């Protein structure tokens, strides 16, 4: 069974998001083993110098990379990444399985983005859209897309 890990900066505080995440995690349990890890975000005042922003990203980046093994296929959610359609994402996940990639880790960075080290570690950079979304909402959206991809892959009715 495919192992999917989601590593994200920050804590989800909104109950409606937690409930949605819990629901999709339950749905996904028939298809994958899911692990979700929250990484503490660095204190970040409104106005930071460029050097301070880099320090924040570096510290968060160290924590993001800490639990990622060398064999894991890493997908970074990134505004500058490539976009998928839902069927294309499903096909990509199927291709990973065919290549023997049994462990896939998705990274959702903090409000300032991610460090250069995190970008280097990423095997793929995926953009959901050119729009900016709240990071906690991205976790729910990611789980929904993973669920949709699993259903498409199995030929089950869901994708419309």
From Swiss-Prot:
It is found in: Cytoplasm. The keyword Methyltransferase applies. CDD domains: RlmH-like. One of its GO terms (molecular function) is rRNA (pseudouridine-N3-)-methyltransferase activity. Its main location: cytoplasm. Its EC number is 2.1.1.177. Homodimer. Belongs to the RNA methyltransferase RlmH family. This is Ribosomal RNA large subunit methyltransferase H. It comes from Desulfitobacterium hafniense (strain DSM 10664 / DCB-2). The gene is rlmH.
């Amino acid at each position: 069974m495919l192992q999917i890990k989601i590593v994200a900066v920050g804590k989800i505080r909104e109950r409606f998001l937690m409930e949605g995440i819990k629901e999709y995690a339950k749905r996904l349990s028939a298809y994958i083993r899911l692990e979700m890890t929250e990484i503490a975000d660095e204190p970040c005042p409104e106005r930071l110098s460029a050097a301070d922003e880099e320090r924040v990203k570096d510290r968060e980046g160290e924590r993001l990379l800490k639990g990622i093994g060398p064999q894991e296929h890493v997908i970074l959610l990134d505004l500058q990444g490539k976009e998928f359609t839902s069927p294309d994402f499903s096909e990509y996940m199927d291709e990973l399985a065919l290549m023997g990639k049994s462990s896939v880790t998705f990274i959702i960075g903090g409000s300032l983005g991610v460090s250069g080290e995190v970008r280097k570690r990423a095997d793929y950079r995926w953009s959901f859209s050119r729009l900016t979304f709240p990071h906690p909402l991205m976790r729910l959206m990611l789980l929904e897309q993973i669920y949709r991809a699993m259903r498409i892959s199995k030929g089950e009715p869901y994708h419309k």
